[in-house]
Amino acid sequence: METISYAECLKEMFALGRFGIKLELETIADILKKLGEPEKKFQSIHIAGTNGKGSIASYIASILSCSGFKVGLYTSPHLIKFNERFCINGNMVSNEDVVEAYLAVKQADIGERKATFFEISTAMAFYLFAKENVEWAVIETGMGGRLDATNVLKPEVTVISNLSMEHTEYLGDTLEKIAAEKGGIIKYNTPLVTGVAQESAIEVLKNIAQKESSPIYIYGNDFTAIKSCEVELGTKFTYNGMGVVWENMETQLLGEHQVQNSAIALAVCELLMNKQNQQTNKDIHIIDKNKRLTQESIRKGLSLTKWAGRLEYILKKPLVIIDGAHNLDAAENLSKYLAKQHSLTATNNPSKLTMIIGILNDKPYKEMLKYLLPVADQIIFTRANIDRSLDPIVLEEFAITIGSVKTKVIENVDNAVEYAIKNATENACICIAGSLYVAGEAREKILKDFI
């Protein structure tokens, strides 16, 4: 097998380009067959949805790990380092592992159509998880579901976090069409857990689930969560499940939406625990007592979950928050959180809020800014180092038409972060948002120069 450096490996991968999106499963299936079908060597949870996929995946992976299992977690995109996409028990894989997996997949990629970036990285994830003998893999889709490269799995549970209008050029221009695409991950006789709220979309998912003889568990109907109180940088809530009530559950991930995300993860774990207990009753000898989901391990795994770049308090002086907020729903969630926590009307320690915003050119930037502008005192518009970044001057020009907030353009994320931090006043709060790419570049800058 050829050998290349880690840098050369990444250069080859990124040269495949983001716009090489091909929604079909034949290519990935062919590659995996040549690799010995690594995706069949572990149990899996498969997660689709518009927002919250990564948080839910992280909760489940943390809980399974705290329950004694060896767990792989595959998410995208990465914030700083490509290896973040492939984690095993909370640790990203090594550079050497990435190169080995890439070369193995590259050698198997000899079909009529060359694989895309996402197909190759997905095959790499399955190769790495099989090689490391993980017992569980928690797998996040890239886009959609039905024809997403991850949809070669036969999971134990599928999850659709929520739905909104996104990637319409690929997934369809109505919620019902998008629901049908994401519902394509539903497998025969495999439970679906979902937080989808729109009735028309729920009906689509119910129809697919019925055809596949798959039970469906819906947040708000079959299980729910009730927030009890906020703790320092976290939330406590009661989980009302399908057959259990767990009080004083705690997540350190911030925002009202994380209570629902937590509940979805807990519903998955409740189903897995029920299945585990049924197996124990059948044959007590086959169960490893050190590898068991319990209420205690679930509680611990939930409370320990971290998910970088999502309402992450990364610096205390000045207070700096990073949140990807890369689409309309995420921007709305962020604006609600900021309005509550950092508005000028706050009775305790009122603060001035500076936002650093950069948005990609395929996002509804006008609608996103309508949510974000009212909560800020000043906005610095910038752009990530990626071709799809929207010109920050375009963002500023629109901002000027809808409000009187003070604006500034600083083309480079590093310079924008440095300017905001060095010019921060007493009690200042800085929030960096609009794109996971902006979040990643800002996070790297802060960790390097300010911590």
Where are these regions (language model features)?
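Short functional linear segments
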Residues: 1-49, 56-67, 74, 110-112
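ATP-dependent carboxylate-amine ligase catalytic core
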Residues: 25, 32-40, 66-153, 169-171
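Nucleotide phosphate-binding/pyrophosphate-handling subdomain across enzymes
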Residues: 40, 131, 136-141, 148-159, ...
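Short Gly/Thr/Asp-enriched flexible loops that form oxyanion-binding sites at enzyme active sites
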Residues: 60, 146-156, 443-447
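Conserved catalytic-core segment of NTP-binding enzymes
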Residues: 145-147, 154-213, 365
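Beta-strand->loop->alpha-helix junctions that form or flank phosphate-binding loops
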Residues: 195-196, 210-230, 251-256, 293-304, ...
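C-terminal helical cap/extension that packs against the catalytic core
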Residues: 198-207, 211-216, 319-321, 328, ...
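Active-site-proximal loop/hinge segments that shape catalytic or ion-binding/gating pockets
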Residues: 435
